[in-house]
Amino acid sequence: MAEGHGDAKGATAHTAADGGHKAPFPPFQKETFASQLVSLTIAFVALYLIVSKLALPRVGGVIEERQKTIDGDLAAAQKLKGESDDALKAYEAELAAARTRAQAIGAETREKLNAAAEAERKTLEERLSAKLADAEKTIAATRTAAMGNVRGIASEAAAAIVQQLAGVQPDSKALDSAVNASIKG
């Protein structure tokens, strides 16, 4: 039986030497380091050439285009800011002019209203003065008429009293002169 399975010593020796592996991992083999370094150098040079000739110019172009866009946007924003500042100054100037016009219109209207009120006041004073003069004339006429009636009534009353007391008809001139003296005071 031992013959069919082989030599036990040989199997143990073979297994112990290989450790269960056939060969070491290729990158760790010392014999292939030089060829691996050459392959790595060729790969990095090729990658550098591809990146520097194709990718970097595209990225640089994108960056330049983006910078141009940013610069253009900043210039447009500065221009619009200047325009808005100019518009604000024009608005403020127009607003100041409108205030001045409004104040002038207010002053003019105030002057017109004051002049109209003064004219109306003068007209009213003239009408009131005319009415007062007419009223004074009416009062004077009424007083004169009343005084005339008072003289007549006083003369008649005095004549009646003298006739009643003295039994004699008094002289009308003497009676009028006595009544006038009595009225004057």
From Swiss-Prot:
List GO molecular-function terms, semicolon-separated: proton-transporting ATP synthase activity, rotational mechanism; proton-transporting ATPase activity, rotational mechanism
Gene Ontology cellular-component terms for this entry are: plasma membrane; proton-transporting ATP synthase complex
**Chief location of this protein within or outside the cell:** membrane
Which residues are listed as membrane-spanning? Answer: 32-51
* Biased segments, Low complexity type: 9-18
The answer to whether keyword Cell wall biogenesis/degradation applies is: no
- Top-rank lineage group of the source organism: Bacteria
- What is the membrane topology listed in the Swiss-Prot or TrEMBL record? Single-pass membrane protein
Q: Name one Pfam family in it.
A: ATP-synt_B
Q: Does the keyword tRNA processing apply?
A: no
The listed locations are: Cell inner membrane
Q: Which UniProt keywords apply?
A: ATP synthesis, Cell inner membrane, Cell membrane, CF(0), Hydrogen ion transport, Ion transport, Membrane, Transmembrane, Transmembrane helix, Transport
Q: What are the boundaries of the region Disordered?
A: 1-23
What does the protein in this record do?
F(1)F(0) ATP synthase produces ATP from ADP in the presence of a proton or sodium gradient. F-type ATPases consist of two structural domains, F(1) containing the extramembraneous catalytic core and F(0) containing the membrane proton channel, linked together by a central stalk and a peripheral stalk. During catalysis, ATP synthesis in the catalytic domain of F(1) is coupled via a rotary mechanism of the central stalk subunits to proton translocation.
Sequence similarity:
Belongs to the ATPase B chain family.
Quaternary structure, from the entry: F-type ATPases have 2 components, F(1) - the catalytic core - and F(0) - the membrane proton channel. F(1) has five subunits: alpha(3), beta(3), gamma(1), delta(1), epsilon(1). F(0) has three main subunits: a(1), b(2) and c(10-14). The alpha and beta chains form an alternating ring which encloses part of the gamma chain. F(1) is attached to F(0) by a central stalk formed by the gamma and epsilon chains, while a peripheral stalk is formed by the delta and b chains.
Give the HAMAP family listed for this entry: ATP_synth_b_bprime
Any idea what this protein is called? Answer: ATP synthase subunit b 2
**Source species:** Rhodopseudomonas palustris (strain HaA2)
Which gene name does the record give?
Answer: atpF2
